[in-house]
Curated annotation (Swiss-Prot):
It is found in: Membrane. PANTHER family: OS09G0467300 PROTEIN-RELATED, PURINE PERMEASE 19-RELATED. It comes from Arabidopsis thaliana. Residues 1-29 are annotated as: Disordered. Keywords: Membrane, Phosphoprotein, Transmembrane, Transmembrane helix, Transport. Pfam families: PUNUT (PF16913). One of its GO terms (cellular component) is membrane. This is Putative purine permease 19. Residues 1-16 have a biased composition (Basic and acidic residues). The modification Phosphoserine is found at S30. InterPro entries: PUP_plant. It comes from the Eukaryota. The keyword Transport applies. GO terms for molecular function: purine nucleobase transmembrane transporter activity; purine nucleoside transmembrane transporter activity.
Length: 392
């Protein structure tokens, strides 16, 4: 299940040679190619499902643990100066679980490593290095900007929804993304799901509305954070299209990209943590954590792992489908995230049943709409491949 192609759209000349096109009857060759295409398509859909589950699970856990962290450190109290501290720590924790993905990479390569992967990666080292540096800087940028926007701007979640707009703009320019009515419908529904989901819940890190200057700074940080995140997704897709060697396993490429970019982002955030002096606040949080010191450490570890799992799923979806689909899946999970948030922390007392149900339906339909678009595209390519095989 090491998806070695971006999508199940064609059979390569090497694969044709392996099954003996020139030495077998046409009907046997056609049957072999069709069977190969069916297996490839099935594995591709399985990987789509797995990566989507990683995104949803990671987003749910990271949101719940982040709210738990804010409550237990006292950052949910309005007008408390502590509420605006610790942004560099948050951004560093968001990327710090790269040793986990590095272990997965070693495990994968020890089981499925090939010589062609190593030689191809070495030949394009310069381009790969530039790609990982760019992504690492963007990871660090949006992590820090989101951390500031989340704690300084009451409208953060509404600004966050513009992420889908920026992704669609960047992917059109950078990745030459083609749009159809199902993709557009999916974008509209996933945006509606996020909007209704925001209406139906709150959060422990929503700041006070009377902080004028902080509100303005937080809004701008949230805005530029969405730009940086959307740009990072599109650069990932460009990397898979133009930079990552086609001979390299897609699984290996996804994990390697996530590991290297997260490592660079962690180093940048670590420098920011010490330069800003925020490292001095860690001891206070550790000592005053309401549930005790062991749970403080465990909550940060769990939060970091949850964010890494979500990011790994996002990168996988970018590789398998597109940056836009990756963003849509994340947005469609918003209703589920907010429903679980309300159940876990009881942030909203008002009757918001209509908004929760509407958001959940919109999220499901938005995801289904994009999946149907992928299904139609895959079927069209299969038919084209079969007709081409018949003419051979």
């Amino acid at each position: 299940m090491g998806f070695h192609t971006k999508s199940p759209d064609r059979v390569t000349h090497e694969e044709e040679a392996n099954i003996g096109v020139d030495n077998q009857p046409r009907e046997t060759t056609s049957t072999s190619l069709n069977r190969s295409q069916i297996i490839k398509t099935r594995n591709w859909w399985i990987c789509i499902f797995v990566c989507s589950c990683l995104v949803v699970a990671g987003r749910v856990l990271s949101t719940l643990l982040l709210n738990f962290y804010f409550i237990q450190t006292g950052r949910d109290v309005c007008d408390d100066p502590k509420q605006f501290k610790g942004t560099w720590l948050q951004s560093m924790v968001q990327n710090a679980a790269f040793p986990f993905t590095a272990f997965l990479l070693l495990l994968w390569r020890s089981s499925f490593s090939t010589h062609s992967e190593t030689s191809s990666s070495s030949s394009s080292f310069g381009k790969l290095f530039l790609l990982y540096i760019s992504l690492g800087v963007l990871f660090a940028a949006y992590s820090q900007l989101y951390a500031i926007g989340r704690t300084h701007c009451v409208f953060f979640l509404w600004i966050f929804t513009s992420q889908l707009i920026f992704t669609s703009i960047f992917t059109t320019i950078i990745n030459k993304q083609k749009f159809n009515r199902w993709i557009i419908l999916s974008m509209v529904l996933s945006g509606a799901a996020t909007g209704l989901g925001i209406t139906s819940s709150g959060g422990a890190y929503i700041p006070c509305e009377n902080e004028g200057s902080k509100m303005s700074n937080g809004a701008w940080c949230a805005f530029f954070g969405t730009v940086a995140f959307s740009l990072s997704l599109c650069i990932m897709q460009l990397g898979f299209q133009k930079v990552i060697p086609t001979t390299q396993s897609r699984v290996s490429a996804v994990i390697l990209m996530q590991t290297n970019a997260s490592m660079i982002a962690t180093l940048i955030c670590l420098v920011g943590l010490f330069v800003s002096g925020e490292f001095k606040d860690i001891k206070e949080d550790f000592e005053t954590f309401k549930k005790g010191k062991p749970l403080y450490v465990l909550s940060l570890i769990g939060l970091s792992l949850a964010w890494q799992v979500m990011s790994l799923g996002l990168v996988g979806l970018v590789c398998l489908a597109s940056s836009l689909f990756s963003n849509v899946v994340s947005f469609c999970s918003t209703p589920l995230v907010n429903i679980l948030l309300v159940l876990a922390f009881r942030f909203t007392d008002a009757d918001v049943k209509f908004f929760k149900e509407g958001a959940l339906v919109a999220g499901i339909l938005g995801f289904a709409s994009y999946v149907y678009s992928l299904y139609k595209s895959t079927k069209k390519k299969e038919i084209a491949s079969q007709s081409q095989t018949t003419r051979v």
